[in-house]
């Protein structure tokens, strides 16, 4: 049976991950640790014999720079790349820039967990005159006002990620090309929920660690057979637990 593989990588630790702040569409770069995580992901993929024909990422530099570092370690810096806002992190609305633990102290752990992980729960909206509104950013100049979020739930993130998967990424895989996607915790959770047909309760508890390759294997009909992380299982579990704990009051 022919097996097709897809590799997903959540960007390495960003400066705002390090500071435990809600990031969303804010364009913050990788921390030094994040660069190291991205390079380590590339080295691991190389050791495991992976190479690719095409790459996808978001229009946010923490994902773009993660992909650069991964491809550099693979000696595939030349690889064609498509960047799309549809792979951006979920938009966190008026929470963007706020410290997660301080927000939990103010509103309670459960409210922040729902804002972070609730399927249809949206954080408080931005206003259009807020400097954080994406309509002020030239990279989104071609988007309609309807496409520009003031906030997003995971459900709304799915509404943009999955059509992009079905219309753009999957056809390329079906043509025989080997694909890697470097994106974000919630855009990747959106894809995992769809591919694995997860319930809203199951996806609530899924935390994707930074800078760890996540491999999907598909059958000849492009139905997922299994998914697994590359690397040390204990280290990966610890990183995922750390992601889960970010939204708790100290």
UniProtKB/Swiss-Prot annotation:
Strongly inhibited by vanadate. It comes from Escherichia coli (strain K12). Its EC number is 5.4.2.11. Has a 10-fold higher specific activity than BPG-independent phosphoglycerate mutase. Inhibition by vanadate is a diagnostic test for discrimination between the cofactor-dependent (GpmA) and -independent (GpmI) phosphoglycerate mutases. Pathway: Carbohydrate degradation; glycolysis; pyruvate from D-glyceraldehyde 3-phosphate: step 3/5. Induction: Regulated by the Fur protein. Catalyzes the interconversion of 2-phosphoglycerate and 3-phosphoglycerate. GO terms for molecular function: ATP binding; guanosine tetraphosphate binding; phosphoglycerate mutase activity; protein homodimerization activity. Substrate binds at residues 10-17, 23-24, 62, 89-92, 100, 116-117, 185-186. Gene3D superfamilies: Phosphoglycerate mutase-like. The modification N6-acetyllysine is found at residues 18, 100, 106. InterPro entries: His_Pase_superF_clade-1, His_PPase_superfam, PG/BPGM_mutase_AS, Phosphogly_mut1. GO terms for biological process: canonical glycolysis; gluconeogenesis. Belongs to the phosphoglycerate mutase family. BPG-dependent PGAM subfamily. The active site is at 11 (tele-phosphohistidine intermediate), 89 (proton donor/acceptor). SMART domains: PGAM. The record marks 184 as: Transition state stabilizer. Pfam families: His_Phos_1 (PF00300). It comes from the Bacteria. Keywords: Acetylation, Gluconeogenesis, Glycolysis, Isomerase. This is 2,3-bisphosphoglycerate-dependent phosphoglycerate mutase. It catalyses: (2R)-2-phosphoglycerate = (2R)-3-phosphoglycerate. Homodimer.
